Amino acid sequence: QHADPLFVQVEPFSEWVVQGTACKSPIRLEGVAYVNDLEPYIERKLFSVNTGHATVAYTGALQGYETIDEAMQDNLVVIQLRAVLHETGKLLIAKGGFDAAEHEKYIEKIIGRFQNKYISDAISRVARTPLRKLGNHERFIRPMVELTQIDEMPFHLLETIGMVLDRKST
């Protein structure tokens, strides 16, 4: 808590992707990625940031942690996160045409974001509504199904889904 009620704590992470065909101005802003199709970037955010955040929450909850940054100090949690992000990364690279090396940098950026001790995020908040997160078009089930459609077995996503179900039962 901060003495100033208007104080807002933010993180240095940002990503600004704009559909270039919708942009009428010839002016190009620094730090903005102009793309023809936003859908791969929307999926990348869902299958990397959202799936990753939830993976840390459910893995961390099982280990008894209360915050995301606290859970990220546990090598077991980080190993599970990396494994899940590499599985979803295979899908994003195959489907969205992302460069493998660039996607690896994106994964590292996400991991660094979750390790930020100055942005405390409660696992209880991130892990709430587990049934919604197991929806057909959500962060776990959709990439799991789509990975099997390209003959990839999503072992770590399945393991995380088990953790979500375990959390649901408590």
Where are these regions (language model features)?
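Substrate/ligand-engaging "lid" and interaction regions
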Residues: 1-169
